[in-house]
UniProtKB/Swiss-Prot annotation:
Name assigned to this protein: S-adenosylmethionine:tRNA ribosyltransferase-isomerase
Catalytic activity: 7-aminomethyl-7-carbaguanosine(34) in tRNA + S-adenosyl-L-methionine = epoxyqueuosine(34) in tRNA + adenine + L-methionine + 2 H(+)
Organism this protein belongs to: Clostridium kluyveri (strain ATCC 8527 / DSM 555 / NBRC 12016 / NCIMB 10680 / K1)
EC numbers for this chain: 2.4.99.17
Biological process per Gene Ontology, one example term: tRNA wobble guanine modification
GO cellular component assignments: cytoplasm
Length: 341
C-alpha cells in the first residue's frame, strides 16, 4: 500500500488550536464495525456504550516539560533542547535547534545556572547526546525551567500546562500527550466505575516520532520509532478477566492500542511486561487484544490513521474522516474523538 492511500482533504480551520473548557463536552463520532452506521454524540455519552465487565485501558504517561531554552557558555547564543530519550540519570538524547551551535564539548546554562549541560556526542541522525549537571531532583528542575513541547500544528500558546495532560497522568516521560485520554474527566471515570466498567492503566511514553511524517512511498518500507512501555500484573489480570468472561477490551488511544498489541499473544492474553516497542500497525494486521477503540482524528498520511484503518478498514475510515470534515469536527490533539465498536 502507498502512503497516498491514507490522504484526505482537511481544511486548516478544523485543526483545534486549544482544548475545550470542559474536557468531556467534545464531540464523539460513534462507528459500528458490523453495520457501518455513523452516529454523532458528545464524548461523555461514551458511558452508554460500555457495559459492566468491560475493561477500558488508559495510558497514564505524563508529558515532560521537555523543551529547554539554554545559553551557550562561550558565545551566549540561545539554543533549544528537546529531551527525547533518557539514557541514565544525567544523560539524554536530545533534538537541538540550531544544531550548528551544539558541537561536542560545547557547554550550556539553563535558568540562572541551576542546570548545566555538555554535548558529549552526536548521533548519525543529528540528535545530540547531552550530559546534564544539577543538584536536587531533575524532574523538579525541569518543572521550573522546561516548557511543554506542543505539536507543530498548534500555533497558539497554552496558558495552562495541565490542559495537555490527562487527569490520570502520573508516569513522567512523554514528549506528547496520549490525546484520546484528554477527553476524560474525574466525573466521567467515576461514572464508568459506578457502572461496573473496569479501568486498567498501562504506560507508554510517547516519543516525538509520533509527529514525524512517513517519508517513503510504500508504507511497508517505513521504519517505526521505538517507545518504552510497561504493564503491571494488576492491569494484565483485568484485561485477561474481561477476555475470559466475554467482555470487551476498549483501548483509549493508539498508544494503549500499540502496547496491548505488542504484549498480546495469539489468544489475546497479556502479561506483566515492560520494554520497547516499534510495532507498526497498518491494514492487513490482525488485532489480538483490542475489541473497541477510542481515538482522536489524526493527520493525513500518518501512521495513526493507518492503525485506525487496520481496525476499521481503510475505505470505512476515510469515509468517516470525510463525514467529520463535512460536519466540522475538530481535528488532532485538542480535537474531537471517534469510538469504533
Amino acid at each position: 500500500m502507498e502512503v497516498t492511500d491514507f490522504d484526505f482533504y482537511l481544511p486548516e480551520e478544523l485543526i483545534a488550536q486549544k482544548p475545550l473548557e470542559q474536557r468531556d463536552e467534545g464531540r464523539l463520532m460513534v462507528l459500528d464495525k458490523k453495520t457501518g452506521k455513523v452516529c454523532h454524540k458528545i464524548f461523555k455519552d461514551i458511558v452508554y456504550y460500555l457495559n459492566p465487565g468491560d475493561c477500558v485501558v488508559l495510558n497514564d504517561t505524563r508529558v515532560l516539560p521537555a523543551r529547554l531554552i539554554g545559553v551557550r557558555e562561550d558565545t551566549m547564543g540561545k539554543i533549544e533542547f528537546l529531551l527525547l530519550k533518557r539514557r541514565d540519570n544525567f544523560t539524554w538524547e536530545t533534538l537541538v535547534k540550531p544544531g550548528r551551535r551544539a558541537k561536542v564539548g560545547n557547554r550550556f546554562n539553563f535558568g540562572s545556572g541551576q542546570l548545566k549541560a555538555e554535548v558529549v556526542s552526536i548521533n548519525e541522525d543529528g540528535n545530540r547526546i547531552v550530559r546534564f549537571e544539577y543538584n536536587g531532583v531533575f524532574e523538579e528542575i525541569l518543572d521550573k525551567l522546561g516548557q511543554i513541547p506542543l505539536p507543530p500544528y498548534i500555533k497558539e500558546k497554552l496558558e495552562n500546562k495541565e490542559l495537555y495532560q490527562t487527569v490520570y497522568s502520573k508516569e513522567e516521560g512523554s514528549a506528547a500527550a496520549p490525546t484520546a485520554g484528554l477527553h476524560f474527566t474525574e466525573e466521567l471515570l467515576r461514572e464508568l466505575r459506578e457502572k461496573g466498567v473496569n479501568l486498567a492503566f498501562l504506560t507508554l511514553h510517547v516519543g516525538l516520532g509520533t509527529f514525524r511524517p512517513v517519508k517513503v512511498e510504500n508504507i511497508e518500507d517505513h521504519a517505526m520509532h521505538s517507545e518504552f512501555y510497561s504493564m503491571s500484573k494488576e492491569t494484565a489480570d483485568m484485561i485477561n478477566a474481561a477476555k475470559e468472561s466475554g467482555h470487551s477490551v476498549i483501548s483509549v488511544g493508539t498508544t494503549s492500542c500499540r502496547t496491548l498489541e505488542t504484549i498480546g499473544d495469539e489468544n489475546g492474553r497479556v502479561k506483566e511486561q515492560s520494554g520497547w516497542t516499534d510495532i507498526f500497525i497498518y491494514p492487513g494486521y490482525k488485532y489480538k487484544v483490542v475489541d473497541k477503540l477510542i481515538t482522536n482524528f489524526h493527520l493525513p498520511k500518518s501512521t495513526l490513521i493507518m492503525l485506525v484503518s487496520a481496525f476499521y478498514g481503510r475505505e470505512n475510515t476515510l469515509h468517516a474522516y470525510n463525514v467529520a470534515v463535512k460536519e466540522k469536527y475538530r481535528f488532532f490533539s485538542f480535537g474531537d474523538a471517534m469510538f469504533i465498536k
